[in-house]
């Protein structure tokens, strides 16, 4: 019997791994049918905990990406990127302290929402004006723990970086990109066993507190072999929240658009790669640079990594500030119509693990293809304390916080994806140009109209059972009634789909859990 039980456990683990790809670090450990991550950029830990309980849990979100949580440089104008200049590995940031972090993780896990921490392992802060730094002669943030116990020999020096000022010049040269400094930030020598252990200790502390995994910032600038050695030291996830022997979920920032040099696939045995082709290619389609009909085989045939190795997005904290990509391609909340369409497609299309951006407001100032205000940090008071997020009666947030994850058109598409599950794309239709529709088996259906100056008015096969469905783009199913439009599916699975040429939200989405009768 014991041998049989062990065999069953082994088969279960093998099946779980096959669903989430070949890497032991590719499983996000969502609960139930949940399937979507949102990035709550630089929210306070207490606000995140409350959001899990009042919105993210009930609306079916699977997890949250946090901004970096460890002690960091404090720069004069409090830019958002100071969190990406760590000075040590104590949980202490603008978002809160360790006790607040611990409480947040517990409260979110309790309602089925996983936590993924943005981890900066490539570097420590540079010797810039400000305070919060360590061996490079600046004080500690909050004057805690006498630095991270790192010394100059724990960083790459001229013996391994040969550029004139030790900064990266050629980002496609693996040795230079991984041994030299990223924008002047002190590059950690992860071939050092001491550095590896320090970083593993920090990750293990987060794991023991109940996080499900992490985003690996700037993975492109770290040797895969060094990361593999560090990950080999990691604990399994906390069994108070996860099944025994669960490995942490890790997804890697590897900016790659094709060609030679450092590839996304170099990192997929260590988790998922953030697929930059995805945002760029869908942005070009939504902007009508390429025909919408071409997305019929969107994913790996477009040069992307396999679906089980991908995390996908249409916006991010870097993209919306044009730190990669460019003005006229990248889509963000300043162009809400385009963002909603791109996000709807991402959530309807069965490729990768999707992540939804949730932003705060800042005043863009575009000059010469750059945002001159791209440094502006989160909403804060005169002392630099981050302002709380306050939900409004209409489910939006106070004006300082954009809260795209609370937009009806987005959270209802999160539900769409959860309902569609592993169903394949079916009932594809297009007009040969900028109108498409497709189903997800017998569970869900979406139609999108980006045709210039032309509505979509057509009877289409949906694959859904006969009945009347709430259109989740224009409203919700509440109290047995639709607050928006409806779509009627006949006995043959067909429905009259109507999307006006001037529609603010040029798509219709229905699924079996929004069926009236």
UniProtKB/Swiss-Prot annotation:
Pfam families: Alpha-amylase, Alpha-amylase_C. Chloride binds at residues 215, 355. Disulfide bonds join 52-108, 397-403, 470-482. Optimum pH is 6.5. Active in slightly acidic to neutral pH range. The record marks 318 as: Transition state stabilizer. It is found in: Secreted. One of its GO terms (cellular component) is extracellular region. Monomer. This is Alpha-amylase.
